[in-house]
């Protein structure tokens, strides 16, 4: 498969590719762009960004698409693979002067057919809250740039909240906001709450707000993402480090260093057990949340990796007998149904497996990456990589596919985290099998066995109903969590060991294993799909969405979906 993907050097733009599920096809009529369809001159502009939200309306057209190109921002009804895009009827269109949108995020919790909250970050540091359906601009945060003057790199709603959101800047700082708070016209004053190696958390002294300021690493904070259960926050920075925090307590859970250069992007696996990163080393790196270590790297791109994303619809638990696939809607719909219902089916499949036969269970995670080399790569993370040194057994597979509701035992950061103020010992060198340097996963068996008791995997995704019931309580706890974070006196905080890890000394340690010390993944496919660098990769139920810097948002129909397309 890898040879098919890499193939000969060519400038030909691919319009289809094949995986084990079947044929993926580009749908030209489902392409979204600026209404004039003229390629955007990307010189000096921020990356094109895309956000989705589903309004759960009764018309069947519940998906909404927001994308930013240069100084322009558009919101459309996203018709996906079924109908052609109508660029003449945007829900909302905005053109900004003096600044450019850099990122945006819908609030999925509060979205309805009548109203949706959209956060937009800008190159000058401001953040705007708008409702593209009601056409109302609700609020502008950091309006006078008193909080931070640098470019907004990432903005996201706090999971389960209708009012809290987090904003990262190229300064390396990250700020929490509350849409219900009033922000003054003077610069805020912060006091130190917690400090660790290469990070510090401050509290705003204002009586009207209790917002936090995080300073993480050195250089720009390029992206952050919440774990599927909302308890942990992962950040990647220009200094090349991945850092994972307990969000409420601001405790550092674990870190990882890139092979070279800055880390630009990351994504959690649907069950919260793994994080994939990409960056300036042209690699994708898979990091285990439970073990706090790199478990694999992937080499397929020829330039910086700009986006990584897991595909929850092909991430699966399967019996040893392979599933039959064909280019038909029925078979692929069965696969999607299985993907959506993994939470319920995982236990039933494993129980049935244990009671009927001895066929092993296989765990496969699918993720994708796009880069500045204009290539799309798809990767499979399989059980031989996840659990080296051990024969595949039903008990082992059972232990590792359960307990994704809360993150694994030991996730408080104390049980498995390498102390942040010291460089881990070097890994053993090996010129034979790449697994030789990987620690024996059997030592984690007791942790994994305890994880089983927490219940059936839900891939850490709360239902909309559950989130609405819980978000008020979460907001109350997070608004008062500073007492927990600041439990130590300021004197003790000032005595925290400020020693910094020397990046040059991390190579060959568990923070940054050598290339020969961890398994090297080859892409399933690696296809050139655009003329300009790729900046977007989103996996939806019936398609894959990509976008390039020319401003074209492309829809790739999954196998079996093209036949029902309506112009």
From Swiss-Prot:
Protein name according to UniProt: WD repeat-containing protein 20
Role, per record: Regulator of deubiquitinating complexes. Activates deubiquitinating activity of complexes containing USP12. Anchors at the base of the ubiquitin-contacting loop of USP12 and remotely modulates the catalytic center of the enzyme. Regulates shuttling of complexes containing USP12 between the plasma membrane, cytoplasm and nucleus.
Keyword set, alphabetical order: Acetylation, Cytoplasm, Nucleus, Phosphoprotein, Repeat, WD repeat
Gene Ontology MF, one: deubiquitinase activator activity
Subcellular location: Cytoplasm; Nucleus
UniProt xrefs under PANTHER family: WD REPEAT PROTEIN, WD REPEAT-CONTAINING PROTEIN 20
Gene Ontology CC, one term: nucleus
Region feature (Disordered): 408-441, 468-493
Start-end of Basic residues biased regions: 468-481
Modification Phosphoserine occurs at: 355, 358, 430, 432, 463
Gene designation: Wdr20
Short name of any one Pfam family annotated for the protein: WD40
Positions of WD repeats: 147-187, 216-257, 258-297, 345-389, 529-566
SUBUNIT field: Interacts with USP12; promotes translocation of USP12/WDR20 to the plasma membrane. Component of the USP12/WDR20/WDR48 deubiquitinating complex. Interacts with USP46; contributes to the cytoplasmic localization of the USP46/WDR20 complex. Component of the USP12/DMWD/WDR48 deubiquitinating complex.
N-acetylalanine PTM sites in chain numbering: 2
């Amino acid at each position: 498969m890898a040879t098919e993907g890499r193939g000969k050097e060519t400038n030909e733009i691919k319009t289809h590719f094949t995986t084990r599920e079947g044929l993926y096809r580009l749908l030209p009529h489902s392409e979204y762009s600026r209404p004039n369809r003229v390629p955007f001159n990307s010189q000096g502009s921020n990356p094109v960004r895309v956000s989705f939200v589903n309004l759960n309306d009764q018309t069947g057209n519940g998906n909404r698409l927001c994308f930013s190109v240069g100084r322009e921002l558009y919101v459309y009804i996203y018709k996906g693979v079924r109908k052609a895009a109508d660029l003449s009827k945007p829900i909302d269109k905005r053109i900004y002067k003096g600044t450019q949108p850099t990122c945006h995020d819908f609030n999925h919790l509060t979205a309805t057919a009548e109203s949706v909250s959209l956060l937009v970050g800008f190159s000058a540091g401001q953040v705007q809250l708008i409702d593209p359906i009601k056409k109302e601009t609700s609020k502008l945060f950091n309006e006078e740039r008193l909080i931070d003057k640098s470019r907004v790199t990432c903005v996201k709603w706090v999971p389960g909240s209708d009012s809290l959101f987090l904003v990262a800047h190229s300064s390396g700082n990250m700020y929490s906001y509350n849409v219900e708070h009033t922000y003054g016209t003077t610069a805020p004053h912060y006091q130190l709450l917690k400090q660790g190696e290469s990070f510090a958390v401050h509290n705003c002294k204002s009586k009207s707000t209790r917002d936090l300021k995080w300073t993480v690493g050195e250089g720009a904070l390029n992206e952050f993402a919440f774990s599927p259960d909302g308890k942990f926050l992962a950040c990647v920075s220009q200094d090349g480090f991945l850092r994972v925090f307990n969000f409420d307590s601001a405790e550092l859970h674990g870190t990882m260093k890139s092979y070279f250069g800055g880390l630009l992007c990351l994504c959690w696996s649907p069950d919260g057990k793994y994080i994939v990163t990409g960056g300036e080393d042209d690699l994708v790196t898979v990091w285990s949340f439970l073990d706090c270590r790199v478990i694999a790297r992937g080499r397929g791109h020829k330039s910086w990796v700009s986006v990584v994303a897991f595909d929850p619809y092909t991430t699966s638990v399967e019996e040893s007998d392979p599933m039959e696939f064909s280019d038909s809607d029925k078979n692929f719909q069965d696969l999607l149904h299985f993907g959506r219902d993994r939470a319920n089916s995982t236990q039933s499949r494993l129980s049935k497996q244990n009671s009927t036969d001895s066929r092993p269970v296989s765990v496969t995670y699918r993720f994708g990456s796009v880069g500045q080399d204009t290539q799309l790569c798809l990767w499979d993370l399989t059980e031989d990589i996840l659990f080296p040194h051990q024969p595949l057994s039903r008990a082992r597979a059972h232990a590792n596919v359960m307990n994704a509701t809360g993150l694994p035992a030991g996730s408080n950061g104390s049980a498995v985290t390498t102390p942040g103020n010291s460089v881990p010992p070097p890994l053993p060198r090996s010129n034979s099998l790449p697994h030789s340097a990987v620690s024996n996963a059997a030592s984690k068996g007791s942790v994994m066995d305890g994880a089983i008791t927490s219940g059936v995997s839900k891939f850490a995704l709360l239902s909309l109903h559950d989130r609405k019931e819980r978000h008020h309580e979460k907001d109350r706890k997070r608004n008062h969590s500073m007492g927990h974070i600041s439990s130590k006196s300021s004197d003790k905080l000032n005595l925290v060991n400020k020693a910094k890890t020397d990046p040059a000394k991390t190579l060959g340690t568990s923070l940054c294993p050598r290339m020969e010390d961890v398994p090297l993944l080859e892409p399933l496919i690696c296809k050139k799909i655009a003329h300009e660098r790729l900046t977007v990769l989103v996996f939806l139920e019936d398609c894959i969405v990509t976008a390039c810097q020319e401003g074209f948002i492309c829809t790739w129909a999954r196998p079996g979906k093209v036949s029902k397309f309506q112009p």
